[in-house]
């Protein structure tokens, strides 16, 4: 019983989040993550200079160092756009397109211990778990899908702040050397939300 209690203490938040994954439509899932998803720890350890470094942190945090999934970088040509408008009744509306022919998407609802509640989207293909991977198979597949909390492409928080990564294929990168934690585009979006 002590071992089970220890395992729950270590993985309870992640297991609870994994159990919320629901298929909404072809290529569309949703999940809710309540609690600490490790973002403060990510910043405290210096952030990450690359998607690969960020992936290493995510795998280590979610698995507590017990395993690391095989991943490969997603690529391709793309260009995204967003729209923000006010409806006739005064409501603020925010939307985006996913400029991929076909991709698996996750609606990610987060309620962090230290931050604002938000809803965001993730292109699951960008997690790099392979073309045949889906988040609704085994518990292991669902657990891997928790990485979508970090790989968001847009979102809105409870205060109304909307952010988006408008992707355009390019080769040049930006490298700034400061005393602040390193962040990638997607970790910057998570930080803002």
Task: Show which residues each predicted segment covers.
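N-terminal mature-domain region immediately after signal-peptide cleavage
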Residues: 3-193
């Amino acid at each position: 019983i002590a071992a089970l209690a220890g395992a729950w203490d270590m993985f309870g938040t992640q297991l609870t989040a994994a159990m919320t994954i629901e298929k909404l439509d072809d290529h569309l899932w949703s999940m809710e993550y309540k609690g600490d998803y490790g973002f403060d720890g990510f910043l405290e350890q210096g952030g990450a200079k690359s998607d690969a470094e960020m992936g290493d942190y995510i795998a280590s945090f979610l698995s507590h160092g017990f395993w690391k999934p095989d991943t490969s970088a997603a690529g391709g040509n793309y260009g995204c756009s967003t729209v923000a408008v006010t409806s006739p009744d005064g409501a603020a509306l925010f939307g985006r397109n996913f400029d991929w022919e076909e991709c698996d998407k996750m609606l990610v609802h987060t309620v962090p211990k230290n931050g604002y509640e938000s809803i965001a989207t993730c292109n699951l293909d960008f997690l790099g778990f392979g073309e045949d991977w889906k988040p609704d198979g085994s518990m292991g597949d669902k657990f891997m899908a928790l990485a979508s909390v970090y790989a968001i492409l847009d979102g809105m928080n409870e205060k109304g702040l909307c952010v988006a990564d408008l992707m355009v294929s390019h080769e040049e990168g930006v490298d700034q050397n400061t005393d602040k934690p390193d962040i990638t585009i997607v970790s910057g979006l998570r930080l803002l939300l």
